[in-house]
Amino acid sequence: MAKLILATFAVVFLALAATSLAGDPDMLQDVCVADYKSLRGPLRLNGIPCKRLENVTANDFFFDGLTNAGNTTNAVGSLVTAASVERLPGLNTMGVSMARIDYAPWGLSPPHTHPRATEIMFVAEGTLDVGFVTTANKLFTRTVSKGEVFVFPRGLVHFQRNSGNTSALAIAAFNSQLPGTQSIADTLFGAAPPLPSDTLARAFQVDGGMVESIKSKFPPKY
């Protein structure tokens, strides 16, 4: 656990060092702890309104959700535990967040994007095959081992796969309080309302029956 904590601090330091290129607007006050109660009303804005300073406590800046391994018993064999503004209100306006990613043996983080942030990933345990694809369809990929770091540029499709017979663990940092995640398969085949099957069939050059079969594996998430 001590090694994990040190690794976490290292990743956060690297993320903070890049705040001049943060994906979020600059903050205009010392702190702006997210006031979740305000989200119940009709007001919506690019961020979350601040809690009154007299109501802010140290717990608003604390999160222990990364201490335990995530349950990787699922179809892809991985689980992301995010420490974003949705779980850590003190991150509001800070322009950073992080996540813990647990991988079962041969587990996969399927191709996805973070539309609002660059990701820097530190491998704490195991070995991962990782990569991203540029807008020119060029793939950059390599194997990343324990103690090594890899960067995924903002908005580009990328993946990670555990290439070993044992569990793996990675810690990721983002230059946004809420980087967002779009899984390519979920987005295309599990949208609500669904994308037209003939559109997907023509895009992937397959028949409609195959599209419907794939859609059945990705129920819409509302």
UniProtKB/Swiss-Prot annotation:
- Ranges for domain Cupin type-1: 64-212
Q: Which GO terms describe its cellular component?
A: apoplast; plasmodesma
State how it assembles: Oligomer (believed to be a pentamer but probably hexamer).
The protein's role, per its UniProt record: May play a role in plant defense. Probably has no oxalate oxidase activity even if the active site is conserved.
* Name of the protein in its database record: Putative germin-like protein 3-2
Q: Which cysteines are joined by disulfide bonds?
A: 32-50
Q: Where in the cell is it found?
A: Secreted, Extracellular space, Apoplast
One GO process term, biological-process aspect: regulation of root development
Q: Which InterPro entries match?
A: Cupin_1, Germin, Germin_Mn-BS, RmlC-like_jellyroll, RmlC_Cupin_sf
- Domain of life, source organism: Eukaryota
Query: Can you tell me which family this protein belongs to?
Result: Belongs to the germin family.
Gene Ontology molecular function: manganese ion binding
Q: Where do the record's glycosylation annotations fall on this chain?
A: 55, 71, 165
Signal peptide residues on this chain, from the entry's feature table:
1-22
Ordered alphabetically, the record's keywords are: Apoplast, Disulfide bond, Glycoprotein, Manganese, Metal-binding, Secreted, Signal
Species this protein is from: Oryza sativa subsp. japonica (Rice)
Q: What is its main location?
A: secreted
- For the ligand (Mn(2+)), the binding residues are 112, 114, 119, 158
